[in-house]
Amino acid sequence: MVTVGHSSESYGSGDAERSSATNGQHDHPALTTVPSDGSIEIVGRLRQASNQTFLVKITGTADHDGVQDDDHDGDHETELHGVYKPIEGERPLWDFPIGTLGFREVAAYQVSRFGGFDVVPVTVLADGPFGPGSLQIWVDSEADEVDRLVDLVPVDKVPDNGWFPVVEGYAADDSPIAVIHADDRRLRMLAVFDALVNNADRKGGHILASQGRVFGVDHGICFHTENKLRTLLWGWAGEQLTEDELTKIRTVSDGAVDLLADLLNEEEIEALMLRAEGLIISGRLPYPHGDWHTIPWPPF
């Protein structure tokens, strides 16, 4: 049975009950379908993932209002797919405590939802076939659309307008190539979100596109207390944050303690609030820095 350890409304009270409705009406099932109760069936394993990651079928009830409620007035019988990452399947990392990656996945969703970023599919804690872990609604990504957002091209084929070159290298045949990303407002929202949560692994494969939306996935190594921002989305480095982006950052900072107390430790929450303060004071997206590898590898 699916046992949701923390529903969307479990994180705080009062102001912390605000949802991403401030960013307009939800228009994608990955933002509105919250698994409530039911069974998880393993469909297959996603072998390319570094940790144990399973495609699952969830059969049972789910809330479709974006925020669960105790009386389940919004519940409907449903069958949907998700990505299940059991805690016991986490690979040890030298710089992140073992057994915390699933909580960080859920924390990233909560920041996205609460701040109104709407860039992370619904993610909850659940008891699955291999024990507790994170459970995220599956997004059927449109590969052609992703290619219009992040791409790998010959250096002499980098477009003059609408794209940012991020890093250059060499292909297997020693021909020069460049990683580029689009100057796209949806992608920029993901870049702002990553700067706030200190995402250490924004690869091209962690960017999905579906029904006009852009999503980020794989947030298990976010929220470190040290600066570990590592991303392909450096095209807006140093650019001024918009008032809408600043409002989202302030919203998260103001509600961070209640929002994330069950998911992150005090030092990690404090570091999040300090990053928010730094972004607000500077008013700009951060630049890459020299004391950390700022491009994920491999980039795709």
Give a label for each model feature:
Residues 1:
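Non-catalytic, low-structured ubiquitin/UBL-interacting segments
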Residues 4, 97, 210-300:
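C-terminal catalytic region of ATP-dependent kinase domains
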Residues 36-171, 176, 192-200, 204, ...:
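Conserved ATP-binding subdomain of kinase catalytic cores across diverse folds
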Residues 101, 182-189, 200, 226:
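Short capping loops/turns at secondary-structure boundaries
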